[in-house]
């Protein structure tokens, strides 16, 4: 059911583009940090409130324009319990703005993370089928290929006649999971679509041109996640521009 909801949001917004929230404090506007430091002092609360303000502002920019938001859990949980509170609040705010919320945590056991209220959770496929145990109204997205620098050391090892990550993708897709494939290469996208022709793909950091093999003739089948939008000076204008740029490659009908 949860995947159906995501696909409905994509069709309603006419774009397969999601906002990614994975903020690094040293990349936020100095003005935002200064405002909260002046208010609370140089304490954890100032930093977490800056993250809350930053995230809320971006959700406002995405509302009505984008179908979904991807929230990187570690960006908030690194700030402790107050960061966890911000993460939960942002998921609630995303729902209020009719954005499908994906919690990116790569969980081996999704159960503890479902309490945050996200519609979907990314899971670690190396835990086996246990990582896919979610209620019918939630979605497990298996992170078969990750974007961290050393990920390829394991994920590209050969498993039979193909890379390990492709073998995992096939197994996860057979069990009904969506797949997260962090790549900027069209060859990777083409390979996973060949192995998993019906799987829904989340493509972090991939542009429209390289993501093209993921989509069918109706612009269905995948969601791109853009983390550059979170650092723009004018998020609303940046979202509008990103949607227009993607439409040159993918048209949703």
Residue ranges: model-predicted function:
Residues 214-253:
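C-terminal helical cap(s) of enzyme catalytic domains, especially alpha/beta-barrels
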Residues 19, 69, 121, 192, ...:
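Conserved, mostly hydrophobic/aromatic
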Residues 69-80, 100-107, 119-130, 143-145, ...:
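Catalytic beta/alpha-barrel core
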Residues 184-224:
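A C-terminal functional module that forms or caps the active site or interfaces directly
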Residues 47-62, 109-113, 165, 210-213:
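Short, acidic/polar
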Residues 1-86, 93-96, 240, 244, ...:
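Conserved N-terminal beta1-alpha1 strand-loop-helix module at the mouth
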Residues 24-25, 29, 36-37, 42, ...:
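Conserved anion-binding
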Residues 56, 81-103, 138, 194-196, ...:
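Alpha-helix-loop-beta-strand connector modules within alpha/beta enzyme cores
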């Amino acid at each position: 059911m949860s995947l159906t909801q995501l696909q409905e949001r994509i069709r309603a917004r006419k774009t397969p583009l999601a906002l990614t929230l994975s903020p690094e404090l040293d990349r936020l506007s100095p003005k935002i940090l200064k405002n909260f430091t002046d208010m609370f002092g140089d304490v954890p609360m100032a930093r977490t409130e800056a993250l809350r303000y930053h995230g809320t502002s971006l959700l406002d920019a995405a509302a009505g324009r984008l179908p979904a938001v991807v929230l990187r859990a570690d960006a908030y949980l690194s700030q402790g319990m107050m960061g966890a509170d911000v993460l939960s609040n942002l998921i609630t705010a995303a729902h209020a703005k009719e954005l499908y919320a994906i919690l990116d945590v790569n969980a081996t056991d999704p159960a503890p993370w479902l309490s945050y209220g996200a519609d979907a959770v990314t899971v670690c496929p190396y835990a086996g089928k246990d990582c896919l145990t979610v209620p019918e109204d939630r979605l497990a997205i298996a992170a078969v290929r990750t974007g961290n620098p050393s990920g390829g050391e394991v994920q590209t090892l050969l498993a039979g006649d193909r890379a390990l990550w492709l073998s995992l993708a096939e197994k996860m897709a057979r069990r009904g999971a969506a797949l997260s494939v962090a790549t900027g290469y069209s060859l990777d996208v083409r390979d996973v679509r060949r192995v998993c022709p019906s799987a829904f793909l989340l493509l972090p950091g991939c542009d429209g041109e390289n993501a093209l093999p993921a989509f069918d003739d109706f612009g269905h089948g995948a969601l791109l996640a853009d983390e550059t939008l979170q650092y723009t000076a004018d998020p609303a204008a940046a979202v509008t521009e990103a949607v227009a740029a993607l439409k040159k490659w993918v048209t949703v009908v």
